[in-house]
C-alpha cells in the first residue's frame, strides 16, 4: 500500500520509500528509496554514497551505471542541455528516422540511448550530470537529437535519486537516471514481498 497524499504538498524526505512511475515504459510502478534530493550532488565511491561531498552511512552501494562521476541532481528552474557529442553518427542526417521505433526501443532498453545517440550528454546549469530519460517520450526532442542538434529546456519539476535496498543489483537511478517529481505517486507504507519481510515499511 502507498500513501498517495503526503507528496501532494511536500517532496519526499531522504531515505523515505517512494512509489513512482519509472521513466522508460512510463507505466511500471517501482518502490525505491529517495536518497538524493533536488539540487544536491551525489557520488558513489568505494561503496559509500556521498551527498554534497559528505559520506553517508545508510548502506553500501555499487557504483555500476554511475562510475566515479559526481552528479548534480536537477531541480525546478534549472537549465538542461541534452548534447549529442562530437562523434555523433552523421549518417542519421541522411536517412529517414522512425522516431516511434526509436522511442519503443529506448523504452525497453534505456542503455540503447547511446546506440542511437553516442556520447549523449546531459548538462544542468553548465555541469554534466546523469541520465534524464523523460525526453524519450517527446518526439520533437528525439528528432532533434537524432540529427545532432542540442536541445535546451528549462526544467518544470524537481528530480530525485532513487536507489533500491538491493544495493548491488537494483534497477534504479544508477541505470535509468533521475526520477521526476511528477512521477512520484506516494510514499510506500506496507510491504507485501518478499514474504519474510511483510509489514510496515521503515
What function would you assign to each model-found segment?
Residues 1-202:
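Soluble "head" domains of membrane/secretory-pathway proteins
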Amino acid at each position: 500500500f502507498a500513501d498517495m497524499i503526503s507528496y501532494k504538498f511536500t517532496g519526499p524526505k531522504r531515505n523515505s520509500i517512494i512509489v513512482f512511475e519509472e521513466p522508460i515504459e512510463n507505466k511500471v510502478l517501482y518502490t525505491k528509496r529517495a536518497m538524493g534530493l533536488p539540487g544536491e550532488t551525489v557520488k558513489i565511491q568505494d561503496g559509500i554514497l556521498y551527498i554534497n561531498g559528505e559520506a553517508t552511512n545508510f548502506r553500501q552501494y555499487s557504483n555500476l551505471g554511475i562510475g566515479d562521476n559526481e552528479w548534480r541532481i536537477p531541480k525546478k528552474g534549472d537549465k538542461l542541455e541534452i548534447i549529442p557529442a562530437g562523434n555523433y553518427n552523421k549518417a542519421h542526417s541522411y536517412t529517414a528516422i522512425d522516431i516511434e521505433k526509436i522511442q519503443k526501443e529506448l523504452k525497453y532498453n534505456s542503455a540503447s540511448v547511446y546506440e542511437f545517440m553516442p556520447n549523449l550528454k546531459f548538462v544542468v546549469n553548465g555541469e554534466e550530470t546523469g541520465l534524464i530519460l523523460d525526453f524519450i517520450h517527446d518526439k520533437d526532442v528525439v528528432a532533434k537529437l537524432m540529427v545532432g542538434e542540442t536541445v535546451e529546456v528549462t526544467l518544470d519539476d524537481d528530480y530525485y535519486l532513487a536507489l533500491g535496498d538491493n544495493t548491488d543489483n537494483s534497477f534504479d537511478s544508477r541505470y535509468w537516471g533521475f526520477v521526476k517529481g511528477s512521477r512520484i505517486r506516494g510514499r510506500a507504507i506496507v510491504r507485501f514481498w518478499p514474504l519474510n519481510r511483510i509489514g510496515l515499511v521503515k
